[in-house]
């Protein structure tokens, strides 16, 4: 529509130009006729021949002008047709170029749109991946924080348990030392009684040799001595049973000591593996090692406690006669079994519950704490 309208406007401008030329010529001719008429009206003396000649010349000029105008009009029409053809050609070329440009522009625009969509999708994908990584990292950080918090709480709990165990062992150690002192006092008392019995026996033997003539008195003294002997035999049997119990307890402590050494070896192996984690507990383990050294020192002092001497035992089957005027010691205090209660549990403490047992218990407790840390 636009190209056709342009062609029409161009043709109209050409036609208007030709028409304007004709109108100019006619105006000139009309002016000439008007002048001639005016001249005729004003003067009657004008020569008609000259007027005719002049009109003929004017007519020739007008014909020439009309011919010239017609030629120009034809020329303009030809030019107009040529211009129309050129305009159509240029319009077609411009239309093809315009369509090509529009097609290229649309292709370029479509390509840019696709590239933009692709970049936008990639950006959205990167944003999505970034958000997923951030959520994953946040969850991982939260998980590690909770794990560290649980480990710290567990370490605090184990530290409290270890502290309570250490205090309990300290109380048990004090009770064991007190029981040991009581046992040593009782042992010294029994040792003095055995020494006294030994002296009495020596005196009785000497008296029996000196008083062999007095048979009746000797028989009476013999009966009394046999009664004392039975009493001493009962005491000796009681001491023998205590010795058997002590031997059994010592064997049990030996087994516990072997188990403690095995646990100690395992603890040392685990300690080498957990050296990095054990730095935080180094000070506490050093304190426990010092307490263990004290317990071992207590054990060493316990191992030096003297047992009942064989020379103090009464010899069964032999009669003893006292000297004249002497009487056997009948005011012997019966042996009392020393019983104490542990302050931590309230149970009756074994008098043979020595520092070796405490050492085993402390070592086993430390091994259990370290093993729990390794499992965690």
From Swiss-Prot:
Among its keywords, does the record have Signal? yes
Pfam families in the record, alphabetically? Gram_pos_anchor, M, YSIRK_signal
The membrane-topology field of this record reads: Peptidoglycan-anchor
The Pentaglycyl murein peptidoglycan amidated threonine modification is found at 345
Region (Disordered) spans which residues? 69-271, 292-348
Q: Where is the composition biased (Basic and acidic residues)?
A: 72-146, 156-203, 211-245, 253-271
Q: What are this entry's molecular-function GO terms? A: IgG binding
Signal peptide start-end: 1-41
Q: Where are the C-type repeats located?
A: 153-187, 195-229, 237-271
Localization, per the record, is: Secreted, Cell wall
Which PROSITE patterns does this chain map to? GRAM_POS_ANCHORING, SMCR, SMDRR
* UniProt keyword annotations, A-Z: Cell wall, IgG-binding protein, Peptidoglycan-anchor, Repeat, Secreted, Signal
Q: Please tell me one Gene Ontology term that the record gives under cellular component.
A: extracellular region
What residues make up the propeptide removed on maturation?
346-376
Q: Which InterPro entries match?
A: LPXTG_anchor, M_anchor, M_repeat, SMCR, SMDRR, YSIRK_signal_dom
Main localization of the protein described in the UniProt heading: secreted
Superkingdom, taxonomy of origin: Bacteria
Which residue ranges contain the repeat D? 272-277, 278-283, 286-291, 293-298
The short sequence motif called LPXTG sorting signal sits at 342-346
NCBIfam families registered for this protein in UniProt: LPXTG_anchor (TIGR01167), YSIRK_signal (TIGR01168)
State the family named in the UniProt similarity comment for this chain: Belongs to the M protein family.
Q: Would you tell me the protein name for this molecule? A: Immunoglobulin G-binding protein H
């Amino acid at each position: 529509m636009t190209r056709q309208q342009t062609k029409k406007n161009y043709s109209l401008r050409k036609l208007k130009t030709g028409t304007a030329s004709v109108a100019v010529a006619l105006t000139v001719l009309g002016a000439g006729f008007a002048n001639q008429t005016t001249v005729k009206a004003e003067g009657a003396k004008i020569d008609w021949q000259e007027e005719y000649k002049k009109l003929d010349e004017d007519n020739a000029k007008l014909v020439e002008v009309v011919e010239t105008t017609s030629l120009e009009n034809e020329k303009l029409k030809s030019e107009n047709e040529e211009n129309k053809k050129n305009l159509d050609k240029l319009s077609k070329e411009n239309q093809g170029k315009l369509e090509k440009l529009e097609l290229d522009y649309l292709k370029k625009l479509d390509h840019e749109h696709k590239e933009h969509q692709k970049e936008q999708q990639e950006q959205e994908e990167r944003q999505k991946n970034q958000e997923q990584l951030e959520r994953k990292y946040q969850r991982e950080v939260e998980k590690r924080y909770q794990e560290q918090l649980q480990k710290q709480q567990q370490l605090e709990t184990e530290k409290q348990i270890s502290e309570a165990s250490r205090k309990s062992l300290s109380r048990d150690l004090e009770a064991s030392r007190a029981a040991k002192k009581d046992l040593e006092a009782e042992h010294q008392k029994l040792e003095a009684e055995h020494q006294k019995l030994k002296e009495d026996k020596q005196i009785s033997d000497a008296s029996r040799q000196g008083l062999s003539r007095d048979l009746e008195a000797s028989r009476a003294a013999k009966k009394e001595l046999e009664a004392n002997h039975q009493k001493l035999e009962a005491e000796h049997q009681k001491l023998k049973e205590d010795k058997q119990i002590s031997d059994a307890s010592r064997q049990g402590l030996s087994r516990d000591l072997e188990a403690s050494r095995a646990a100690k070896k395992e603890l040392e192996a685990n300690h080498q593996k957990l050296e990095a984690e054990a730095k935080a507990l180094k000070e506490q383990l050093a304190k426990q090692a010092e307490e263990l050294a004290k317990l071992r020192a207590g054990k060493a002092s316990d191992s030096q406690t003297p047992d009942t001497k064989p020379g103090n035992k009464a010899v069964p089957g032999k009669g003893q006669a006292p000297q004249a005027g002497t009487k056997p010691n009948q005011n012997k205090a019966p042996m009392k079994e020393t019983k104490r209660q542990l302050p931590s549990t309230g149970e009756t403490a074994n008098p043979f519950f020595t520092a070796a047992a405490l050492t085993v218990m402390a070592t086993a407790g430390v091994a259990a704490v370290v093993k729990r840390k390794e499992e965690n």
